[in-house]
Amino acid sequence: MPVVWPGGKRFAFTIFDDPDSQDEGVSRLVYALLDDLGLRTTKAVWPLGPRRRPNSPGETCASPSFRRHCQELQARGFEIAFHNATLHASLREETIEGLELFRDYFGRDPLTMANHYNEEAIYWGPAR
């Protein structure tokens, strides 16, 4: 079955931005450019702040300013996605809390996600 692209187009292009190593200042610059260019991309977030030592630098939605920034992006048509609960491995309860926070912050469950490289990710260990 052939793929039918929106608007009769022959292909589609997307960007899925994961939050590793990105701070709010950089995010604001990048998304201002994407917005100016009329591109609507996907920004993944960590809803939950760290509970243990992070294994990646980057912002989480525990920062009210960063959370507002992501909500503003969503309001402008950018998709917000889930990148697991936080920037380190999460227990089941923390993952559930992260999903609940995502719903609270963005008004729905995530439609897309990309695994972070933690123990709960599907590609963790030697198979990664």
Feature locations, PLM:
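Catalytic alpha-helical scaffold of carbohydrate-active enzymes acting on polysaccharides/glycoconjugates
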Residues: M1-R128
